[in-house]
Amino acid sequence: MADNLCGGLPPEVCEQLNKEEQFIKIKLEKRRYGKEVTVIEGLGDDADLKKIASELKSKLAAGGTVKNGRIEIQGDHRERARDLLVKLGFPESNIMVIE
């Protein structure tokens, strides 16, 4: 199926093209009792959200989950999450941090 979408390109090239087409939003939400949660949206259904979330949680030393097609990380990690997503191959120009 992926071959049809990518015109016969190798899977690595197809994956990189998918990353470049995504527009990612990173924002902070306040939860009960003033708890802060960093929310990362726009990674799309094609991205392996659980793998990305696991990598972010490990690097940020924070808990988190994948819910409704978005990654939620406990605490305010907007800037560091952006830097880590860039290291994972997502273009910095497609990542917007909402203050």
UniProtKB/Swiss-Prot annotation:
The keyword Cell inner membrane appears for this protein: no
Keyword Protein biosynthesis: yes
Keywords: Protein biosynthesis, Translation regulation
Domain of life: Archaea
GO biological process, one term: formation of translation preinitiation complex
Family, per entry: Belongs to the SUI1 family.
Name this protein carries in UniProt: Protein translation factor SUI1 homolog
Higher taxonomy: Archaea, Thermoproteota, Thermoprotei, Sulfolobales, Sulfolobaceae
